[in-house]
């Protein structure tokens, strides 16, 4: 069974970077669509989940990317809504690389502080943290038990 990745990108052109990473990560085929909006998602996802039985869907995945994180979150929600019972595939959401960057930074920090990565009860300051990477990093740190302060260089934060 070939491993397939449906790449849904909210930017007009699908990211070449994301496609290369997908192939290097082991995908046999990557089907990339650019300019994806919520209304496009259902039929694309159904194309993935209806062509393979539930036991074979482990060889299919959906990646949501693009530069606009808010648009990506909407596409992600539409992907989840398109699933039907056991007819679902693994989904990765990483618009603008915000999730992978935050996870890498937090992982590095946790292991720099403690060999076991334990940061419970520690204080963490996320500087310039009001953007997508900083907010995700702050959430991960808080979830791991740190007391988190977020700073910003903007006078107003949405």
Label for each model-derived stretch:
Residues 111-158:
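Glycine-rich phosphate/diphosphate-binding loop of Rossmann-like nucleotide-binding domains
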Residues 1-87:
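N-terminal ligand-binding/catalytic initiation module
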Residues 92-110:
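A glycine-rich, Thr/Ser-enriched phosphate-binding loop motif common to dinucleotide/cofactor-binding enzymes
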Residues 67-71, 97-101, 129-134, 154-156:
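Gly/Ser/Thr-rich loops at beta-strand to alpha-helix junctions
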Residues 57-58, 87-88, 142-148:
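Short, surface-exposed connector motifs at secondary-structure boundaries
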Residues 39-46, 104-108, 128-133:
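Solvent-exposed, charged interface segments at domain starts and junctions
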């Amino acid at each position: 069974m070939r491993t397939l990745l449906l790449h849904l990108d909210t930017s007009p052109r699908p990211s070449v970077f994301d496609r290369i990473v997908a192939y290097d990560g082991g995908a046999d085929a990557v089907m990339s669509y650019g300019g994806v909006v919520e209304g496009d998602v259902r039929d694309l996802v159904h194309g993935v989940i209806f062509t393979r039985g539930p036991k074979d869907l482990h060889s299919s995945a959906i990646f949501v990317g693009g530069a606009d994180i808010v648009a990506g979150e909407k596409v992600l929600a539409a992907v989840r809504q398109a699933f039907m019972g056991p007819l679902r595939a693994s989904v990765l959401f990483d618009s603008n690389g915000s999730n992978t960057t935050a996870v890498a930074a937090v992982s590095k920090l946790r292991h720099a502080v403690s060999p076991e990565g334990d940061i419970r009860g520690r204080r963490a300051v996320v500087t310039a943290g009001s953007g997508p990477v900083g907010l995700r990093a702050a959430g991960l740190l808080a979830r791991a038990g740190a007391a988190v302060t977020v700073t910003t260089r903007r006078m107003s934060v949405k």
